[in-house]
Amino acid sequence: MNTYTFDEIDIGKKESFTVTISEEERDKFRELTGDVNPLHNDLSYAKAMGHDRCVAFGMLSASYLSTLAGVYLPGKNSLIQKTEVNFRKPVYVGDTLTITGEVTDRNETFKLIEVKVDIKNQNGEKVVKGKMEIAVAE
């Protein structure tokens, strides 16, 4: 876990990590949220909707923004204030995602950083685009 302070974070600073979406993660997310939409766990339904496989929950992919802020950038000293997320392409169970955050702005007065987030799949396709405003505790 990183412990960057506000003064250690410059515009352009980047951090990234990689995860693979497993069936177990999908099932835990479904149990946690109660979202039983068949697109996520009924292959015949997913195929009828034009997908080759069951679609992973979009918010499961988006939940990795919390990991990005809380573990990597800035890490321990973070408190997310605002998020924006755009889902660009479906994510499927078995996909390997690379989550990258880059600092695009700093607010010295309020000790806030703005982080642009891109999530790409194993084919390099951008599946999620987002932005976070994060307070950095001292």
Feature-to-residue mapping (PLM):
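Hot-dog-fold acyl-thioester-processing enzymes
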Residues: 1-78
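HotDog/MaoC-like acyl-thioester-processing domains
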Residues: 1-14, 92-138
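Mid-chain, well-packed structural core segment of small domains
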Residues: 71-95, 99
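Charge-rich, low-complexity amphipathic helices
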Residues: 51-55, 68, 86-87, 91, ...
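Proline-rich low-complexity regions
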Residues: 38, 74, 90, 136-137
